[in-house]
């Protein structure tokens, strides 16, 4: 494959955009390549600036559950744009999407729309502190909750990709309010809660850790967190930005039967447009301005294009058989990739929950960030490059999840597995 036009665009971009990209992982530094510049996408296919075509398992980092450029979603966006792109005033679209979100998540009696997952988690943390009158939060090593200062501590994902334990520019006074524990280590959480319970406002976590690959909760972990929070009047914030509407219509909370006091959403609910949301019980949400004293605002919050795309997407994934299809196709892909690794004699551990997956270059299992970091990132980088050259677009980091969409066919998956056989033998 030729990548000459993408390389030319990258050189232009580096002159006017820091690092040539607007989000660090897109730079492909962790895999020793230069980034692709995408021209268009349809279904599960990306087409880059050189005309190369790829089967896509990034899905814009998760939102594209129905595939790229779905006609119903595009139609909804175009119809909304024809009426106006932004008003700075309420619309009925905001109510409609909020009603659908609250119906999907019974513990979300009220929801506030924002423009990104970072805004959602940042605002939920502020609300938790305002409601409890406490300052500290507890998060988990390898869980990423956006790039707000207090959450860039042992944050996984892009931070792990570049080997940076925490970002410069985060004041020590901010970081000292953030406690961290190993994911799936309930004993360590109990010890931290016992020591800091008088100052602890919230525990925040990804219910399936998708920013260290794909790490599900061990049996009893979520239930134990829920019990600790109830016992000590700490708010449990479940960050479903990645898992919401992805692993089931009601997210990981429906899948595992554990509910948060506050929930953060994003990705799928915007249908590929910038959106986030956070919500919870009425007695908590009433503390938000204008009813309460906890301030949160946004110029483009509830943007009509994003609301329309979200409404159209949720309608599509409510159709009968959607999640059964996602499960069947994802299981078929996972088994094929496992067989390809075994045939090539390459140590690999494929972990999957629903249509989220990660192929770790190690024997596994992976239950924590420490486990994830034991992966052979050099082998992954070679595999990534081979798969790209064979027409398969994976996330350019060992520490990111991959995603299957409704647009992936059995034929697409067969081609992917064939590419994996060739790629794994080559590395």
UniProtKB/Swiss-Prot annotation:
Sites bearing N6-(pyridoxal phosphate)lysine, chain numbering: 267
Cofactor: pyridoxal 5'-phosphate
Keywords assigned: Cytoplasm, Isomerase, Porphyrin biosynthesis, Pyridoxal phosphate
Cellular compartments per GO CC: cytoplasm
Disulphide bridges: none
Subunit annotation: Homodimer.
Name of the protein this chain belongs to: Glutamate-1-semialdehyde 2,1-aminomutase
Species annotation: Syntrophotalea carbinolica (strain DSM 2380 / NBRC 103641 / GraBd1) (Pelobacter carbinolicus)
Lineage start: Bacteria, Pseudomonadati, Thermodesulfobacteriota, Desulfuromonadia, Desulfuromonadales
């Amino acid at each position: 494959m030729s990548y000459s036009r993408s390389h030319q665009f990258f050189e232009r971009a580096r002159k006017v955009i820091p690092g040539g990209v607007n989000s660090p992982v897109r730079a492909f530094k962790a895999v020793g390549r230069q980034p692709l510049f995408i021209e268009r996408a349809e279904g599960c296919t990306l087409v880059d600036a050189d005309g190369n075509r790829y089967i896509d398992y990034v899905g814009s980092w998760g939102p594209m559950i129905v595939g790229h450029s779905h006609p119903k979603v595009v139609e909804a966006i175009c119809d909304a744009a024809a009426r106006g792109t932004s008003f700075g005033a309420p619309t009925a679209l905001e109510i409609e999407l909020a009603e659908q979100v609250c119906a999907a998540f019974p513990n979300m009696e009220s929801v506030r729309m924002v423009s990104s997952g970072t805004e959602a988690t940042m605002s939920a943390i502020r609300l938790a502190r305002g409601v409890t009158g406490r300052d500290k939060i507890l998060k988990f090593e390898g869980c990423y909750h956006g790039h707000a200062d207090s959450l860039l501590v042992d944050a996984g994902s892009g931070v792990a990709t570049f080997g940076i334990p925490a970002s410069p520019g985060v004041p020590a006074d901010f970081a000292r309010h953030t406690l961290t524990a190993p994911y799936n280590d309930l004993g360590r959480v109990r010890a931290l809660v016992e020591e800091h319970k008088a100052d602890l406002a919230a525990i925040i976590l990804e219910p399936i850790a998708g920013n260290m690959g794909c790490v599900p909760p061990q049996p009893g972990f979520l239930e134990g967190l829920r019990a600790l929070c109830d016992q000590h009047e700490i708010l449990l914030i479940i960050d479903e930005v990645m898992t919401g509407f992805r692993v089931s219509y009601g997210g990981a909370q429906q899948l595992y039967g554990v509910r948060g006091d506050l929930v953060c959403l994003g990705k799928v609910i915007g249908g590929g447009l910038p959106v986030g949301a956070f919500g919870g019980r009425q007695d908590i949400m009433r503390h938000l301005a204008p009813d309460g004293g906890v301030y949160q605002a946004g110029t483009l919050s509830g943007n009509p294009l994003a609301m329309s795309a979200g409404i159209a997407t949720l309608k599509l994934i409510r159709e009968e058989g959607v999640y059964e299809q996602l499960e069947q196709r994802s299981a078929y892909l996972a088994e094929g990739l496992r067989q390809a690794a075994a045939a090539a004699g390459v140590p690999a551990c494929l972990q999957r929950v629903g249509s989220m997956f990660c192929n770790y270059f190690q024997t596994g299992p992976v239950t924590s960030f420490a486990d994830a970091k034991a992966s052979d990132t050099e082998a992954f980088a070679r595999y990534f490059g081979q798969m790209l050259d064979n027409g398969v677009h994976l996330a350019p980091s060992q520490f990111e999840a991959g995603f299957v969409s409704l647009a992936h066919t059995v034929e697409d998956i067969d081609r992917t597995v064939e590419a994996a056989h060739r790629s794994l033998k080559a590395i």
